[in-house]
From Swiss-Prot:
Sequence positions that bind GTP: 166-173, 191-195, 213-216, 280-283, 309-311
Organism whose genome encodes this protein: Acaryochloris marina (strain MBIC 11017)
NCBIfam families linked to this entry: Obg_CgtA, PRK12297.1, PRK12299.1, small_GTP
Protein name per the record: GTPase Obg
Quaternary structure (record): Monomer.
Keywords per UniProt: Cytoplasm, GTP-binding, Hydrolase, Magnesium, Metal-binding, Nucleotide-binding
Superkingdom, natural source: Bacteria
Pfam family, one: GTP1_OBG
Stated family: Belongs to the TRAFAC class OBG-HflX-like GTPase superfamily. OBG GTPase family.
GO cellular component terms given for this protein: cytoplasm
Length: 350
């Protein structure tokens, strides 16, 4: 399945139904008063988060969404039927912006959460509302008001507790594949992974923790180099980062610093996100060189460095145990705070 994590759509709420001009014409009321009903309200356009969707791919092929118009008012003071709302399902983690101003409108993070993005137009008044002492038989009614319409920019930020980061070819995809049932594309060249991969890693408690393999970051990622903005966006919601460094690289310390600089330059507090620092591919190193690189990296980072080989599945139990301990220790609200919904009569949570 192709991964799409941002797109634009057009939404149009239904127009309100027109009010009606009608008069009472019962058998014993030959000259009855006005009895035209109001038009029905137009349907609204509502976004709803769903765990059944993992990508915005559906919106690649369908960009326009229109709700139903309200029906015209009827005789005998009958109000026209309201138009049916248009419900649009999006993946959990979708952030919604006004595409023209890039004003933040809302953030749908939980299954079933909704946001009304375009309100249906009000129905027009029937002629019964224009009865007065001076006009006992009004022959006019009001048309319904048009429904709102907007262009929306949708962005998907993955909801994963643990993000695996590192330079291209550090072994992130291999790690997530051996820890979970995820099967990302794996090859021995940089930038094999061009989309984030999600995997659920089981715990002894019976629970599962979602890991995200973030595609390789490079120098300049915070400025958008190498799709850096697209990749870093998915780190924002993680509670814990597993920073993978290739032990066979010429300068692991420099590789570590490169990623740290990009996290810091991107902002959003990513440089302060809790991390576990990991040297991967230890099966390809002799022990003396490995211990030297581990010591240098620990001295530079001020953190313990865990040794693993994702391919040979060495050191994974120790790493996972540390991941579980960190997650249990960290507060659940460490995940990025939900983006507030714009306080507007037009765009609001429902």
């Amino acid at each position: 399945m192709r991964f799409i994590d941002q797109t634009e759509i057009f939404v149009k709420a239904g127009d309100g139904g027109d009010g009606m001009v009608a008069f009472r014409r019962e058998k014993y009321v030959p000259a009855g008063g006005p009895a035209g009903g109001n038009g029905g309200r137009g349907g609204s356009v509502i976004l709803q988060a769903s765990t059944q969707l993992q990508t915005l791919l559906d919106f690649k092929y369908k960009h326009q969404f229109v709700a139903e118009d309200g029906k015209r008012g009827g005789p005998k003071n009958l109000t026209g039927a309201s138009g049916q709302d248009r419900l649009i399902e999006v993946p959990c983690g979708t952030v919604i912006y006004d595409a023209d101003s890039m004003t933040l409108l809302g953030d749908l993070t939980t299954n079933g959460q909704t946001l009304t993005v375009a309100q249906g137009g009000k129905g027009g008044l029937g002629n019964k509302h224009f009865l007065s002492n001076r006009n006992r038989a009004p022959e006019h009614a009001l048309p319904g008001l048009p429904g709102e319409e907007f262009r929306l920019h949708l962005e998907l930020k993955l909801l994963a507790e643990v993000g695996i980061i590192g330079l291209p070819n550090a072994g992130k995809s291999t790690l997530i594949s051996v820890l979970s049932a995820a099967r990302p594309k794996i090859a021995d060249y940089p930038f094999t992974t061009l989309i984030p991969n999600l995997g659920v890693v089981p715990r002894a408690t019976g629970d599962g923790t979602v890991f995200a393999d973030i595609p390789g970051l490079i120098e300049g990622a915070h400025e958008g180099v190498g799709l850096g903005h697209d990749f870093l966006r998915h780190v924002e919601r993680t509670r814990l980062l597993v920073h993978l460094v290739d032990a066979t690289a010429e300068d692991p310390e420099q590789d570590y610093q490169t990623i740290q600089k990009e996290l810091s330059a991107y902002g959003q507090g990513l440089q302060n996100r809790p991390q576990l620092l990991v040297l991967n591919k230890i099966d390809a190193m002799d022990s003396e060189q490995l211990l030297e690189k581990q010591a240098c990296l620990e001295q530079m980072s001020g953190s313990p460095v865990y040794l693993i080989s994702a391919v040979a599945q060495q050191g994974l139990d120790t790493l996972l145990q540390q991941v579980w301990e960190e997650l249990d220790r960290l507060p659940n609200d460490l995940q990025e705070a939900p983006i507030p919904v714009l306080d507007s009569p037009i765009l609001r949570e429902t």
